[in-house]
Structure formats: structure tokens, C-alpha cells
Amino acid sequence: MKRLVTGLLALSLFLAACGQDSDQQKDGNKEKDDKAKTEQQDKKTNDSSKDKKDNKDDSKDVNKDNKDNSANDNQQQSNSNATNNDQNQTNNNQSSNNQANNNQKSSYVAPYYGQNAAPVARQIYPFNGNKNQALQQLPNFQTALNAANNEANKFGSNNKVYNDYSIEEHNGNYKYVFSFKDPNANGKYSIVTVDYTGQAMVTDPNYQQ
């Protein structure tokens, strides 16, 4: 009987020991599983953070590329605008020059004598030189005539009438010589010169024909 009790007691202790080992093994396996899950979760978290960082870096690169492209577009637009402005300025200058040339051509008046002109200036200063060469140096005929008429009217009658013109040459420099008749004084003329600079000067306000 004692042996039976002793055997049962030994069996109970053995089974209890086996059960404890099994529980410890289960606890160990559970800890391993928990650790593996934790490491896997940490890895996922790290991977997610890395992906976010990579995406952020990619976004920065895209934004930088967009800024660079925008800057290039703005620079190209600025260069294009500057080129267009320069071209417009050139066209405007050409247009102004063409307009000035057209005005000069349209306002050009060939030298002429007054109505029923007496040979006054031509007699005082007969010109036998190269007329075309002289006219190239002298100012526009009508402009010179108007300046001479205004100067002549400063002396005596202020309504003098254009009579005739001639050209005077001295050391390669030319002058217009104009005569203006005084309607209030029979046979009297004002003699006015205009040089190549356009300067008018009365040389004789009461020339008697």
C-alpha cells in the first residue's frame, strides 16, 4: 500500500513538473512571438517613415524642378520681352527716320525767284560755280528764305516781298543771297544772306536798284 501511494505521489510530481515545463515553454514561445511581432512592427514603422521621407525628398525635388522650370520660363519670357522691346524700339526708330526723310522730301522746295523778279541779288553776287554742290551744303531753300524774310522785315517796312536770290562762295563755304523789295519805297531792296548754318544777316537794308 505504501508503495502504491509512493508511486502515485511520484507520478503526480512528474506530471506537475512536465506541466510546469510545458507552461514555461509556452511562455517562452509567446515571448518569442511577441518579440518577433514587435520587431516586424518596428520594421514596418521604419519602412513607412523611410517611405515618407523618400516621398518628401521626391516632393522637394519635384518642387525644385518646378521652381527651376518656372525660373527658366520667366527668364525666357523676360528675354523674349526684352528682344521684342528692342525690336519695337528699332522699328520705331526706323519709322521715325523714314517719317523724317519723307517730311524732308515732301517739304523740299527747289530754289525759285519771286514774281516779276528783277536781277538784284544775281547782279550783286553773280554765281558761276557748281550749283548742286552749293545746294548740298546750304540749308533747305524755303527754310532759308523764311529766315531771311523775317530778318529783312526788322528794318523799315515789315511786309517786304521776295524778289530773287543768288549764291556766294568764299573759301569753299556757300551762302544764299536774297533780295526783298520794299513795297513802300520804289526801287529799294533789302539784301540778306543766309549761311550754311542757317544764320540770316542783313547786309544792306536799303539797296537802291
Swiss-Prot record:
A lipid is attached at C18 (S-diacylglycerol cysteine). Residues 71-105 have a biased composition (Low complexity). GO terms for cellular component: plasma membrane. Residues 17-105 are annotated as: Disordered. It is found in: Cell membrane. Residues 23-70 have a biased composition (Basic and acidic residues). Residues 1-17 form the signal peptide. Keywords: Cell membrane, Lipoprotein, Membrane, Palmitate, Signal. A lipid is attached at C18 (N-palmitoyl cysteine). It is a lipid-anchor. This is Uncharacterized lipoprotein SAOUHSC_02650. It comes from Staphylococcus aureus (strain NCTC 8325 / PS 47).
